[in-house]
Design a protein with these regions (language model features):
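HIT superfamily nucleotide-processing domains
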Residues: 1-134
């Protein structure tokens, strides 16, 4: 059975896509810890990030770096930098969380999630896209 992320890759369900290339996809988390919280995934469904082959794992991190730099530019003045987390429990599809942060407590997955309207999420995704350099 396909993960929810594979369904996003296949455009079976909608997402607020920030960037993609032939192997990787970045889209906004719909239950974000912060404004511009973005998920970066390989298009190939692999449950555990460290089960990716070396080339795919390296490519995922290089792609994530480009997205993080775009988030940094988009969030300038609202966050100090983009934090990174790999948890791997909530969806059985390898993914990296990119979370704009001001301090370490901003990346606490136990805290309540933020809520944004569809229009706000679309505007955030479009704002980040302007800074993506693939």
């Amino acid at each position: 059975m396909s993960s929810i992320f594979t369904k996003i890759v296949n455009r079976e369900i909608p997402a607020y896509i920030v960037a993609e290339d032939e192997n990787y996809l970045a889209f906004l988390d719909i239950n974000p810890l912060a404004k511009a919280h973005t998920l970066v995934i390989p298009k190939k469904e692999v449950s555990y990030i460290f089960d990716l082959d070396d080339e795919s794992l390296a490519g995922l991190w290089i792609f994530a770096k480009k997205i993080a730099k775009a988030i940094d530019k988009y969030m300038q003045g609202e966050a100090i930098r983009t934090g990174v987390a790999v948890v791997g429990l909530e969806v059985p599809h390898a993914h990296i969380h990119l979370v704009p942060i001001k301090n370490i407590t901003d990346i606490d997955f136990a805290k309540p999630k933020m809520k944004f309207s569809s229009e706000e999420l679309q505007n955030i995704a479009e704002g980040i896209k302007k800074f993506v350099e693939l």
